Amino acid sequence: MCSYVAKTLNVSLAEAYKFQKSYFREYGTSLKGLMENHKIDPFDYLDYVHEIDLSIIEKDEKLGSALTKLPGRKIVFTNAATPYAKKVLKKLGIANHFEAIFDIVDANFIPKPEPKVYQQIVAKYNISCETTTMVEDILKNLGPAAEMGMTTVWVNTNKPWSKNNSDGILPDVVIEDLSSWLLGVANA
């Protein structure tokens, strides 16, 4: 990502890193900041940053088993692009568990946690907020879901970026192991 920013803005990698982190914090995604401040082509950016080695991702049998047992609809809501999300889901061996992917392109490049994006996904898929659970690894992205009446689950990865700009957001559930939690819910 930093190499794209450095090349596109003609700055050093160190300067590109500062831009990338600043835009991520301010706009929710680096992409949105680059679009707002530098008028970059979002498709060019997405093609570049999602062309990464996914060999470290392994099939997750436990997660697949949990999703199989879990009733209800499952929709991916991501600030990434659908082709990338599909690659990750396929590597994990769980692609068949999801009926749809709502990505940054569907959202007109407006990232989570912008409330209107949550309204878009709810309308597009006729989601009942009162019976929906949103699982997320970035805490601030749960704020709008909670305000709409969804149950919120934060997967605490213990990464500093996962808590940025999240003051006052209290998820219903905090977990560290998604597969175990889902199995517990499915077996309850």
Could you say what each language-model-derived stretch is?
Residues 1-64, 83:
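N-terminal helical cap/lid subdomain that shapes the substrate entry/recognition surface
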Residues 5-7, 46-49, 73-75, 105-106, ...:
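N-terminal start-of-chain detector that recognizes signal peptides
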Residues 6, 24, 35, 53, ...:
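Short, flexible active-site loop motifs that bind/organize anionic cofactors or intermediates
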Residues 11, 40, 72, 127, ...:
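Short glycine/serine/threonine/alanine-rich loop segments
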Residues 17-19, 50-54, 72, 104-105, ...:
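Short, contiguous strand/loop micro-motifs
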Residues 62-74:
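A short, Lys/Arg-enriched amphipathic alpha-helix followed by its capping loop at the start of a domain
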Residues 68, 81-188:
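Asp-based, Mg2+/Mn2+-dependent phosphohydrolase catalytic module
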